[in-house]
Amino acid sequence: MKKKVLFICVQNSARSHIAAALLNSECGEYFEAHSAGLEPGVLNPLAVEALQDLGIDISGNKTQSVFDVWKSARHIFAYVITMCSESEAEGCPIFAGVTTRLHWSFPDPAKFTGSHEERLKHTRSVVDRIHAKIDSFCEEHCATVP
């Protein structure tokens, strides 16, 4: 059975979608990744574009509240990974059954300024950094998945 992972960022607009898509792509035989936000916003088109460069399409993804995920109790998560600032992460609900809670800090693409090309370049950099973290996570945890 696949272990479930929930990635959380503030608006569920970029970082958490990027991480969930990359984990499902890289290690989907072991994990089922989901994403949510503290205050769901709109899916960031730069995140969509940056992942399309890797052949991953998240254009149909919807944003959702971590509190709605928590209240629905549809999933028992083995890992909850926050991707916002530590102080923002403290506002996340406690999920029953969570084996491990991790915090990965990455810049928010919604806060990038400049031209479209400059913001896309910075977003691609965030995607690369998240991708490296996902690769490390898979190397570390795939060996422990039954």
Language-model regions, residue ranges each:
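Residues at the C-termini of beta-strands that transition into short coil/loop
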Residues: G37, C84, S105-P107
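Conserved active-site segments centered on acidic
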Residues: M1-K71
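Alpha-helix termini
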Residues: K71-R74, V145
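Generic alpha-helical secondary structure signal
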Residues: P45, Q64, H75, E117, ...
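Hydrophobic/aromatic beta-strand patches that form the interior of the parallel beta-sheet core
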Residues: H34, Y79-I81, L102-W104
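Phosphate-binding/catalytic loops
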Residues: E88-P146
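Alpha-helix boundary/capping detector
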Residues: E49, F77-A78, V127
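Mid-chain, well-packed structural core segment of small domains
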Residues: A73-G97
